[in-house]
Amino acid sequence: MTETKNPSAIYSQTQIQKALLRLMKKNRYENLTVKEILYEAKIARKTFYRNFTSKADVMDSLVKKTMTQYTQKLLQLENENLDLFFDAIFDVVKSNRSFFKLLSRNNLLHLVSEELNTYIPVIHDMYFSDCSFFKTLSKQQITFVIAFNIGAIWNVISRWIQEDMKTPEEEIKTGLVKYLSTSN
């Protein structure tokens, strides 16, 4: 997606993103075409390509926007409290419920995992590198611990989404915190 502060371009980008999501409610992502997105968004081909390179670029922009919400919540945490960490991810998923369900239905949840693998190491380096636990590990070990954590948490969240978020998040969170606190 082309980054811009131009209100007209931002409006077009938003219309394109909304059009893709509306179409995904009726059709599989893999079957959608840029032409259908153009028609649904009521914009010209030139406008689309001025803002995005492909439908995958549109999807990527939506995933990035959602993950930005998550990272902003993480950055607001004042300590390394697991409850608050889990609250942040559950809150973002709940507030974007229909988006995550569309991703799940279209086998695209892996896009979030890929984005987390980009965002979380940066946040770690900025805010958690002084944590006493991480000071005992090599840089390579830290990389693998972060990857392990992202994979574990994201698999839990993916399962929750695939089960239509029926299990109360408090139940999931309590089980995870109990497991993590006894596995030392």
Where do the language-model regions lie?
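Amphipathic alpha-helical segments that line or abut small-molecule/effector binding pockets
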Residues: E80-S98, A147, G151
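Amphipathic alpha-helical packing segments from all-alpha helical-bundle domains
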Residues: L109-F134, Q140-N155
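C-terminal peripheral helix-coil segments that are non-catalytic and often amphipathic
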Residues: R159-N184
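Cytosolic nucleotide-binding catalytic cores of signal-transduction proteins
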Residues: T2-E3, K25-N27, T136-L137, F144, ...
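N-terminal intrinsically disordered/low-complexity leader segments
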Residues: M1-A9
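Regular secondary-structure segments
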Residues: Q17-K25, M67, T71, L75, ...
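An amphipathic alpha-helix adjacent to DNA-recognition modules
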Residues: I10-L21, E30-V34, Y39-K42, Y49-N79, ...
